[in-house]
């Protein structure tokens, strides 16, 4: 079973006001206790770690605790270069957000359409995808079964013949394929990016008021000066009280975003897991310039 190691950084400002608190801080830093617990299907090691740890100390911690191929590291902030670099140098697997973002893409789409008071059944969805992985194929199938039309933009069209045949044979659904850099996305209102990187995406002529739901781990930005649409790089969610209470009891709820916490729970579950089991709701969407307002989404979706 995969294990999730939660790296919690100690806020030393809470300890350094008085000499006695300094002693408490250093004692806690040296004699941290690993709390090993289970939540859902995930085993958790609650490991406090300082943001000012030097590289050697981080390596020592990882060497002792992560001597297993089945361990995934999850930090409060993987933009912490020290932690991120050590993870890569030591080839230690860390939890990425791509799986959860893909699973949420349909819910994000429904959230956007609900703001506009439109139905997914009346919407054409364009999907950027390179690989026919299980989860990518699953997302394509689920969207195709609900949307008015689905167009797949890929330079590996041959990889999607099986999903094309399945959708047509079992559901009578025909999907479109395209890889024209000038035409594929030039009139596309809704684009879901499953696995294109920023460089590849910017090779295409993109409709200047498109809404792009980005599912890859890195933020993307459209380089065209004509582009005045929306790129959704992140999302704020909520989930049911039961799961919330479990994370509160572990002391994790206030230290990690709900998106990250849900991702850790779903890591061991089948990609077909219904996230509605956790009563997941979209609260806010975020782009390159911060939170995206509902009025902004409404504007971009209606004008063409």
Which residues does each predicted region cover?
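Adenosine-phosphate binding glycine-rich loop
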Residues: 217-304
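Glycine-rich phosphate/diphosphate-binding loop of Rossmann-like nucleotide-binding domains
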Residues: 115-182
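Short, charged/polar "capping" segments at the starts of alpha-helices
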Residues: 79-85, 136, 157-164, 199-201, ...
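A glycine-rich, Thr/Ser-enriched phosphate-binding loop motif common to dinucleotide/cofactor-binding enzymes
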Residues: 93-111
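A short, well-structured beta->alpha microelement
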Residues: 26-33, 52-54, 164, 168-185, ...
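Structural motif
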Residues: 6-10, 48-50, 75-79, 128-131, ...
């Amino acid at each position: 079973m995969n294990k999730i190691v939660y790296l919690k950084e100690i806020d030393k400002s809470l300890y350094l006001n008085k000499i006695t608190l300094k002693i408490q801080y250093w004692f806690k830093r040296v004699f941290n206790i690993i709390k090993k617990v289970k939540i859902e299907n995930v085993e958790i090691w609650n490991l406090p770690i300082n943001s000012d740890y030097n590289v050697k100390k981080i390596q020592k911690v990882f060497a002792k605790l992560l001597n297993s191929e089945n361990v995934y590291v999850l930090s409060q902030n993987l933009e912490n270069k020290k932690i991120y670099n050590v993870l890569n140098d030591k080839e230690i697997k860390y939890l990425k957000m791509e799986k959860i973002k893909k699973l949420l893409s349909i819910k994000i789409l429904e959230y956007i359409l609900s703001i506009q008071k439109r139905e997914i059944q009346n919407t054409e969805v364009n999907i950027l995808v390179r690989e026919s992985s299980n989860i990518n194929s699953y997302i394509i199938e689920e969207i195709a079964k609900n949307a008015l039309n689905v167009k797949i933009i890929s330079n590996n069209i041959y990889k999607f013949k099986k999903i094309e045949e399945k959708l047509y044979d079992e559901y009578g659904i025909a999907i479109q394929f395209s890889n024209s850099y000038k035409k594929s996305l030039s009139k596309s209102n809704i684009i879901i990016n499953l696995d294109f990187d920023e460089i590849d995406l910017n090779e295409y002529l993109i409709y200047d008021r498109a809404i792009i739901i980005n599912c890859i781990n890195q933020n993307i930005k459209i380089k065209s000066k004509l582009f005045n649409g929306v790129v959704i790089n992140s999302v704020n969610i909520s989930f049911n009280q039961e799961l919330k209470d479990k994370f509160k009891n572990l002391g994790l709820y206030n230290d990690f975003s709900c998106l990250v916490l849900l991702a850790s729970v779903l890591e061991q579950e089948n990609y077909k897991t219904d996230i509605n089991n956790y009563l997941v709701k979209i609260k806010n969407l975020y782009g390159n310039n911060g939170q995206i307002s509902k009025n902004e989404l409404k504007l971009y979706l209606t004008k063409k």
